[in-house]
UniProtKB/Swiss-Prot annotation:
One of its GO terms (molecular function) is metal ion binding. PROSITE patterns: GATASE_TYPE_1. Keywords: ATP-binding, Glutamine amidotransferase, Ligase, Magnesium, Metal-binding, Nucleotide-binding, Pyrimidine biosynthesis. Its EC number is 6.3.4.2. This is CTP synthase. Pathway: Pyrimidine metabolism; CTP biosynthesis via de novo pathway; CTP from UDP: step 2/2. It holds the Pfam family GATase. It comes from Treponema denticola (strain ATCC 35405 / DSM 14222 / CIP 103919 / JCM 8153 / KCTC 15104). It comes from the Bacteria.
Length: 536
């Protein structure tokens, strides 16, 4: 089957859930037996999100091949279970950089470089390139921002041209917009959506499907009005009500007829979707048998999206154990003393310290790791959380004076965590240890029990590592190195032998978790937290 292209645009306001819609479309098509691939186009001028402030952008989702990408790629992977790559995330900055590099190399033979055709052609080449590289039946592209944004115009023009490149029968435009409900008059207002469609039409794009975000169900008269003013058949006007869980969204869209309409408009067989496992997962989420409290102690907790994949991985593990997860978002800066740690963490059945960069809030994380270690509370450290656990143990158990990380103190007396040799004297952007790396797991360890394997591969995003010069000082202690990278002998996993469940990893297991297939470490962490609550 020749690749078909679906483009998702947004209007009226941002943050309506284009990413979830794109992920849901991918899932509905895959559930019918078609192969899919999702990709995201962001109009910002940063080359990638790698150096962007988490408070502005949320988490950086890392692909298996080391791409630092938009968090929406996490939604795509979790919904479709299709591993994505660097080329599935494109920013305007990446597009312009490629064009300027080509121009400097004489690639345009001295010609004038312009937005049309050069920028639009570069965007089209990336869209079509995804189809060529993956061979997917459907290439689903989300266009960031809202229709009418100045920075998004080259992308809108590029997808307009794509329709004529691949043929109307192989291209579809899905437009997502808000239908506000005014309590005062008890009405859904369609005017903002009408103007959004009108704006899209002014750029030469006629949407094929309208997805309407609303708090209330659409009446027959509302559908008729939208159909009249948008040139879209009523059966292609899909309501998208606010769901209690994001994992209910594809089921709601399927019930609203989206899958059927997609197949009808593409003139392909509307196969029976296989959604039973997903439905069962959602039902389990809504009907837990127990509840536990997990304390997430981090640097960016004011914006939960900064830890989106961690939160979703915890939820998935909770679903596996039929357990509701109550997350305590704790700012590590607020933990300044042992008494603070006890006060903030007293209700936690398990503690997780996720990744981060810089020295802000580090003391609070050290006190958190110490509290978990000394009070036998299940602890899961990720990336920075692993480095914190090693430093805390060196300071308080091994009594290594002034143990620290050279990230926090370049002149640290005892840098238990240090910059990797090949990371010194390099620029910040694009220089981290990124993507999949192998790890050999020690026999009899908690990690081996979780993975049921002696060799794994996990995604990394870091510049600092455990300093192997200090390995001997940890020998014969309670902290063991249960996971090592075989190529460079780097410490990837640490555990405490006498602790019920204390595991910290240098990699990011959250990126590999799926709602109906939780990551083994998250699964066992939640089990340990459940047991901890029972045995208290």
């Amino acid at each position: 089957m020749k690749s078909k292209f679906i483009f998702i645009t947004g209007g009226v306001v941002s943050s309506l859930g284009k990413g979830l819609t794109a992920a849901s479309i991918g899932m509905l098509l895959k559930s019918r037996g078609y192969s899919v691939v999702n990709q995201k186009f962001d109009p910002y001028l940063n080359v990638d999100p790698g150096t962007m402030n988490p408070y502005q952008h949320g988490e950086v989702f890392v692909t298996e091949d080391g791409g630092e990408t938009d968090l929406d790629l996490g939604h795509y992977e979790r919904f479709t279970d299709v591993p994505l790559h660097k080329f599935n995330s494109t920013s305007a900055g990446k597009v312009y950089l490629a064009i300027l590099d080509r121009e400097r190399a004489g690639g345009y033979n001295g010609g004038t470089v312009q937005v049309v055709p050069h920028v639009t052609d570069e965007i089209q080449s990336r869209i079509l390139g995804t189809a060529e590289q993956t061979g997917a039946d459907f290439v689903i592209s989300e266009i960031g921002g809202t229709v009418g944004d100045i920075e998004a115009l080259p992308f809108i023009e590029a997808i307009r041209q794509i329709r004529y490149t691949v043929g109307k029968e192989n291209c579809m435009f899905v437009h997502l917009g808000l239908l506000p409900y005014l309590k005062e008059c008890g009405e859904i207002k369609t005017k903002p959506m009408q103007h959004s469609v009108k704006e899209l039409l002014s750029f030469g794009i006629q949407p094929d499907i309208l997805i309407c975000r609303s708090e209330k169900r659409l009446s027959k008269s509302t559908r008729e009005k939208l159909s009249l003013f948008s040139n879209i058949p009523q059966d292609a006007i899909i309501e998208n009500l606010t769901a209690k869980s994001i994992y209910e969204v594809p089921l709601m869209l399927e019930e609203a007829g989206l899958g059927k309409v997609l197949c009808k408009l593409f003139n392909i067989e509307n196969k029976e979707p296989n959604l039973e496992e997903w439905k069962k997962m959602v039902q389990t989420y809504y009907n837990p048998e127990k509840e536990i409290t997990i304390a997430l102690v981090g640097k960016y907790v004011e914006l939960p999206d900064a830890y989106l994949s961690v939160a979703e991985a915890l939820t998935a593990a909770g679903i596996y154990h039929k357990t509701s997860i109550k997350l305590l978002w704790i700012d590590s800066k607020k933990i300044e003393t042992k008494e603070d740690a006890a006060a903030f963490l007293k209700d936690a059945d398990g503690i997780i310290v996720p990744g981060g960069f810089g020295d802000r809030g580090i003391n609070g994380m050290l006190l958190t790791a110490q509290f978990a270690r000394e009070n036998k509370i299940p602890y899961f450290g990720i990336c920075l959380g692993m480095q914190i656990s090693a430093i805390e143990y060196a300071l308080n158990a091994l009594h290594i004076e002034e143990a620290n990380s050279s990230e926090f103190d370049k002149n640290a007396k005892n840098p238990v965590i240090d910059l990797m040799p090949d990371q010194k004297d390099v620029k910040i952007g694009g220089t981290l240890r990124l993507g999949l790396y192998r790890c050999m797991i020690a026999e009899g360890s908690l990690a081996e029990k979780a993975y049921k394997s002696h060799e794994i591969q996990e995604r990394h995003r870091h510049r600092y590592e455990f300093n192997n010069l200090y390995r001997e000082k940890f020998d014969n202690s309670d902290m063991i190195f249960s996971g090592l990278n075989p190529e460079r002998n780097l410490v990837e996993i640490v555990e405490l032998k006498s602790h019920p469940w204390f595991v910290a990893v240098q990699f990011h297991p959250e990126f590999a978790s799926r709602p109906n297939k939780p990551h083994p470490l998250f699964r066992d962490f939640i089990k340990a937290a459940v047991d901890n609550k029972i045995n208290r």
